[in-house]
Amino acid sequence: MNPLRHSFIQSCRFNDPLIPSQKLKYLDIGCGGGIFAESAARLPDTHSVTAIDPTPGVLKIAEAHKRRDPLLMEPGRLTYLNTSIEELPLPKSKEEAYDIVTLFEVLEHVNAPGPFISNLLPHVKPGGWLVMSTIARTWTSWLVTNVMAEDVLGIVPKGTHEWAKYVNEDELRGYFAKEPGWDGSSVRSLGVMYVPGFGWKEVRGGEDWGNYFFAVKRLE
């Protein structure tokens, strides 16, 4: 999944102005063990990555893994914070906001996605991107994630997914179409699917029925 995350972000930023001297600031929300945060921090065009998670246990794992890489130990390169997005201080200026805010495999676990997303928006710099991944609420996704992944194959623990919390791509589009300051025409989405023996693969049109990436740009 991680290589697809990076390629999707690159595709979103393809037409953004390139400023060689300007490096990117990331905010990774619900970072878990730091898989994406670490990989983003190693990119040559990255200035810094702030990764947050409300669960202390997973951050201990992330911190331990970070210490294995001298690059990640450079001051300001990768910072883990044990906090929720609701408790993270709001940026006081454009410079304090982030070029890319990521939310991977989190939205399908929250009770109220609308208010939750509202807490993310101020952290995105004007001209920056909010990039997330989640699961569409369809019978196909229920069969794949609840029945096959949990009950049949045992890939994830039972009870990991609550189908009623899944969020459809058109619901996210509708949310940002009404949200002031966001470019609804910039929305990008891409379906992805786990193929046993081959890993995660892009599935064009898969955003309508299964796992998908979703991104939207904040207006300048």
Question: Where do the model's predicted regions map?
Answer:
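Conserved alpha-helix/loop element of class I SAM-dependent methyltransferases that forms part
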Residues: 2-24, 39
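Class I SAM-dependent methyltransferase SAM/SAH-binding core
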Residues: 27, 32-87
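A C-terminal cap/extension of S-adenosyl-L-methionine-dependent methyltransferases
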Residues: 75, 181-220
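A short acidic, Gly/Pro-enriched loop at the edge of an enzyme's catalytic core
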Residues: 86-101
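A short SAM/SAH-binding and catalytic strip from SAM-dependent methyltransferases
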Residues: 100-111
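A short glycine-rich, Lys/Arg-flanked "PGG" loop and its adjoining helix->strand segment in the class I
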Residues: 114-126
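Conserved class I S-adenosyl-L-methionine
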Residues: 129-154
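Acceptor-substrate binding/catalytic loop of class I
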Residues: 153-171
